[in-house]
């Protein structure tokens, strides 16, 4: 958004999923613990804005519920999100991954472990970007960088 040269000047747009899923009886029962699932994670990240286009990551099919896995055991919850850049040489892939990670870190309980990575085979430098996104120290340093956090916050900004 706001760049002069776009990596993908004409992205394909996809239909959005319905906002609400059917609610089961146990989900209405406040006495039953309702563990987090892939749909809830998808719902948290679907409206993240693309850094280049006036569309959401869902509209561009960058994030998909099918690429989100939630693992829960008695000790911890682990969320793994794969995302698919619109083109294999997308220069914004690291920023998109960071925006997803920051959104989840801000939204989920601190005990939930989060992993964000590029869908295998979908980016020319996926290995390098995945290493950056998995490095807690690099992510923490990025979150302290005002310019980078401004870009991330623009991605996370709710449209008016």
UniProtKB/Swiss-Prot annotation:
GO CC list: cytosolic [4Fe-4S] assembly targeting complex
InterPro entries assigned: FSCA_dom_sf, MIP18, MIP18-like
UniProt entry keywords in alphabetical sequence: Chromosome partition
Superkingdom to which the source organism belongs: Eukaryota
Record region (Disordered): 1-32
One GO process term, biological-process aspect: chromosome segregation
Full protein name: MIP18 family protein F45G2.10
Stored SUPFAM superfamilies: Fe-S cluster assembly (FSCA) domain-like (SSF117916)
The UniProt record lists the keyword Secreted: no
Family statement: Belongs to the MIP18 family.
Function as written in the Swiss-Prot or TrEMBL entry: May play a role in chromosome segregation through establishment of sister chromatid cohesion.
